[in-house]
């Protein structure tokens, strides 16, 4: 593994354990998780559950569009807390549920709406899973010699800033180890 990407910040215990537990319980009760599908040599399930709360329909990944749903008060409060910490304001929250080790997300960049240097906070709840980054190489490939790994814990906030998404890809790999559910909230901003 290489040195950490220069524009990534990990804030341990952004939420206390009790705050994280309460938020996790609310999300598991209230979030409208869906199993989405992409067209890739037929119809293929995206290997995680997803929910979207935002002021616009969220298009991504080979024709998948998550419909706009209002942001609940408890997430509005979290957005305000992130803003108060100096990480920007947001009008959308993508919630991914990794049910076990077979759920994952492939290497990708969050190239949000033409902003070459977006700030994208990401909050982990539940089980810790490796969050890997590697520099982009030609085409859709990554430079494996530049791989770096964080392991955000319950309540940790990881923030990608600057050129992180222009120069790096990130992912949550599969694992055969037994792991509990991990919920990840990724905060987005779009001028609407």
Residue ranges: model-predicted function:
Residues 1-192:
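Non-heme Fe(II) oxygenase metal-center motifs and adjacent flexible, charged/small-residue loops
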